[in-house]
Curated annotation (Swiss-Prot):
Listed PANTHER family: DIPHTHINE METHYL ESTER SYNTHASE, DIPHTHINE SYNTHASE
Gene Ontology biological process terms from the UniProt entry: methylation; protein histidyl modification to diphthamide
Statement: the UniProt record of this protein carries the keyword Nucleotidyltransferase: no
Family: Belongs to the diphthine synthase family.
Gene3D superfamilies the UniProt entry points to: Cobalt-precorrin-4 Transmethylase, Domain 1 (3.40.1010.10), Methyltransferase, Cobalt-precorrin-4 Transmethylase, Domain 2 (3.30.950.10)
Gene giving rise to this polypeptide: dphB
Binding, S-adenosyl-L-methionine: L9, D85, V88, S113, I114, L164, A207, H232
Pathway connected to this protein: Protein modification; peptidyl-diphthamide biosynthesis
Protein name: Diphthine synthase
Any Pfam family: TP_methylase
Reaction(s) the record says it catalyses: 2-[(3S)-amino-3-carboxypropyl]-L-histidyl-[translation elongation factor 2] + 3 S-adenosyl-L-methionine = diphthine-[translation elongation factor 2] + 3 S-adenosyl-L-homocysteine + 3 H(+)
Organism classification: Archaea, Methanobacteriati, Methanobacteriota, Methanomada group, Methanococci
Length: 255
């Protein structure tokens, strides 16, 4: 049996009782934290909550040794833990599908993810378009996909959730400031007037924590602000409903 379980967004208190109960029954627990990470806790605290040792897999072991994990699930009850919800990342979906193909029972234990936590903004969830990711630019690698996604969503009046790059092996987490700078760089190159320094956007910091940071303002002001510890995300606003306008006024710190 393979149990795919999410840990939630911020700390060990996000772990569901259902996950705790299954953890007691399984033979072994694996986890990965390269697609997302819980910044408010440690692996030791999660192990204490689940009352069992956890083997942490790096990116290579998850992507290239999934067959070994799946084969192990044929003979034993295995739990695979991820930050957020277990079925958001394509890699995790692939693991579940491959296990089912081989006749292994797969149980999925859902958990809070950025897609549910984004409700704290007061924005209407059905008005979000395609999600995009902003990554750290590298030599000969500067993808403009986020710009294209924002452009398409804005044409339909939709909001855009921009997830920011995570490189856990380097303990490197893109800040909202860096993400906004990347978008402005792409605009400077493309000059399609999709976004500029006066565009009003949202920044959400530490979603899922007791005291998340919610910030609203023009890019030129937000880009200089200290949003505190990660993780951050950015929301480019589409057409606002009057109730959403009220939410921005009363739920956010206006910068």
């Amino acid at each position: 049996m393979l149990v795919m379980a999410g840990l939630g967004l911020y700390d060990e208190l996000d772990v569901t009782l259902k996950t705790v109960e299954f953890a007691k029954k399984v033979d072994k627990i694996y986890a990965e934290f390269y697609t997302a990470i819980l910044t408010g806790t440690t692996i030791e605290k999660i192990e204490k909550t689940l009352q069992k040792e956890i083997t942490v897999l790096n990116r290579e072991k998850v992507e290239y040794e999934t067959n070994k994990l799946i084969e192990e699930a044929k003979e034993k009850d295995i739990m695979f833990l991820t930050a957020g919800d277990p079925m958001v990342a394509t890699t995790h979906v692939d693991i579940a599908v491959e296990a089912r193909k081989k006749g292994i029972e797969v149980i999925i234990l859902n958990a809070p993810s950025i897609y549910s936590a984004i409700g704290i903004t007061g924005l209407q969830l059905y008005k979000f378009g395609k999600t995009t990711s902003i990554v750290f630019p590298e030599p000969n690698y500067f993808p403009e996909t986020p710009y294209d996604v924002i452009k398409d969503n804005l044409s339909l009046g939709y909001h855009t959730l921009c997830l920011l790059d995570i490189q856990t092996d380097k303990q490197k987490f893109m800040t909202a400031n860096e993400g906004l700078s990347v978008l402005l760089e792409i605009e400077e190159k493309r000059k399609e007037k999709i976004i500029d320094e006066n565009t009003k956007v949202l920044v959400v910091a530490r979603a899922g924590s007791i005291k998340p940071g919610l910030f609203y303002g023009k890019i030129k002001d937000l880009i200089k602000h200290d949003f505190g510890t990660p993780l951050h995300c950015v929301i480019i606003l589409g057409k606002l409903h009057f109730m959403e306008t009220d939410a921005l006024k009363y739920l956010f710190e206006n910068i």
